[in-house]
């Protein structure tokens, strides 16, 4: 078991307040390509532990990169702090150590949200346009996070029909996605 001090609710260098409580790393809930997620004795919080595993081509190629988990943890936490500073809510609570972070338990929406300002990559290929075209307004794309299906592209109506999100959640996702793009 891993013991750590965690502030209840909001904490850290963001001016967050709350009482400290002890938290133990409990049962593993999930293991993916890049991280493991553990429950804590407080049902509102989880501990994310970043791995050194590396994958490519939807997991077909695998390897290990020493220190990758540490870098991913640091980058993720700095990004979450930047987003919160700019009015985008996140699940970040507190960095425990170089590899682990306490996060709020949230509903996982199995969508990848892509904002494009310029035609590139799969967009250019899919629509048969030249790379590098600057769009007059950013575009938004969604893909269904499902390795077995190859993360297919879908629109908001598809996501709602599949029960992945509600109409209200779709609007919230779009609002914050464009806000993140403006922050960059």
Language-model segments: residues:
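Short, positively charged and aromatic/hydrophobic N-terminal segments
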Residues: 1-3, 10, 19
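Short linear sequence motifs
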Residues: 7, 22-23
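Active-site loop/lid in soluble adenylation, ligation, and acyl-transfer enzymes
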Residues: 24-143
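ATP-dependent phospho-/nucleotidyl transfer catalytic cores
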Residues: 102-104, 124-183
């Amino acid at each position: 078991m891993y013991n750590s001090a965690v502030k209840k609710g909001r904490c850290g260098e963001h001016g967050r307040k709350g009482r400290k409580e002890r938290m133990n790393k409990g049962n593993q809930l999930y293991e993916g390509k890049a991280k493991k997620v553990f429950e804590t004795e407080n049902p509102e919080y989880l501990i994310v532990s970043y791995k050194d595993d590396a994958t490519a081509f939807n997991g077909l190629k695998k390897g290990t990169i020493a220190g990758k988990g540490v870098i991913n943890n640091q980058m993720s936490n700095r990004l979450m702090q930047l987003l919160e500073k700019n009015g985008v809510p996140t699940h970040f609570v507190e960095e425990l150590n170089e590899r682990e972070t306490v996060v709020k338990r949230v509903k996982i929406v199995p969508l990848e949200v892509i904002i494009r300002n310029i035609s590139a990559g799969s967009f250019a290929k899919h629509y048969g346009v030249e790379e590098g075209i600057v769009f007059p307004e950013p575009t938004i794309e969604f893909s269904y996070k499902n390795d077995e299906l190859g993360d297919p592209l879908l629109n908001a109506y598809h996501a709602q029909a599949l029960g992945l999100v509600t109409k209200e959640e779709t609007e919230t996702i779009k609002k914050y996605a464009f806000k993140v793009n403006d922050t960059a």
